[in-house]
Amino acid sequence: NNPSTILKVIRKFPDTIDNKNEQLVVILEDAVTNEIKHLHIKPYCSNHSYFGYDYKKTNNTNLIFEGSNIPENTVFMESPNKFDSGEYNYGVECNIVGLTHHGVSEDSIVVSEAVLDKFIFHTYHKKTISFGNNLFPLNIFGDKNSVKIFPNIGDKIGIDGVIMALRKHDPLMAVVEQTEEAYREYDSITDKVICCEYPEAEVVDIHIYKNVTSNSIMPAELEKQLNDYHYSIKKYYEKIVEFYQTLRRNRGDNLNISKEFRQLVIEAMIYTKEPDKIVLTYKNEVLEPWRVHLTLKVKIRPTIGFKWTGDFGDKGVGCTILPEEQMPIDELGN
């Protein structure tokens, strides 16, 4: 990458909404080609359907401010498994022994409880929840003084794994099903309960779409949290559009932008368009009044059934987990 100058830094969420998700869009100008491009900086990486990891910040993050000159090939965030020398730590050093043991059969292996924490990894799960036409959310995370229909960024879901609960609108039952107290409890039989199969997962990102062209049965009092996030995301996109329009006015035909930045601007324009001027669809279906995307980080600690592999093609399935004091030792106590 060529040296560049940072023109604009835009944060996705203000501190009033979230101070745990440091997502930024950094808009830069290439010092060689004068192309306008952008970096999307977020605290985690997940390019797989599930697997991912938390980034490790480098000292170069101190250079992220407007007007800053960025040297070529500058790295802001990198893998936590990379040493300062540039080498990758792609495994865990463990003592291994091959011997006859009652816990071993075929390709099974015995693993010490003491080393399991060294193999902890993260997966990232995406949940998409649409509602508003026939279903409305319940205030299961709030109380009589606040509305909280889903966990905020940085919150961990409970041991029951519940993320959100939706109830079908019934005009005949509204007098008992749509009271302040009824909003705070769900019925696992009659209500639609959305869960994550991994309890205590952490919410790391939230994205919300609001489609005002759809007919909504949403009680206004249950929309506060939704509106707070939607407003913040809209302001984030408005800043992107506003800066792009400033560039167009100042540079005219000389404006040179990357394909990726152009796509970001289009996305921002769609989100900030006058609500009655555009109909939001997904796979040719008109979106419901609200569509919520939640990204959850799950910490996985290996246990029985997980597979371990070595550097030389050796592998096995953990079939027995033993306390450290029950593991075999040699004459030197190793």
Sequence positions of predicted segments:
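Conduit-forming functional cores of very large proteins
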Residues: N1-N334
